[in-house]
């Protein structure tokens, strides 16, 4: 994949995206009681959105699907530890990820949460046209591969 076939997000873009997503969420009247960030890509946006929305209750859900650029497992997998969402049965939960590409990771997380939580909404920085999930809150739509500032540098530790 050529560099010009990619979309590049900067840390500054993340700040703008979070402000705009928070404004969307507020304007819809959705007041989440908790934010669930999908690890690992959703952690920066999830944490920043929790701050922007004044939400102190946060959790993470580890989902493995992508193994490289355009490389993925057959199915997304929930990885331990899986949060106990039973205390949120009547609460409002915002599930946050960086991108809904195929949407299968977000669908797995949303469906898992819907079994335990009263009202589940989804927010992403980017949504792609082929996503099987139509997110409730989206900053940008694109069909390009996205380079995020937290995942673009090469890993320090050898795998």
Regions found by a protein language model. Name each.
Residues 1-159:
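PRPP-associated nucleotide enzymes
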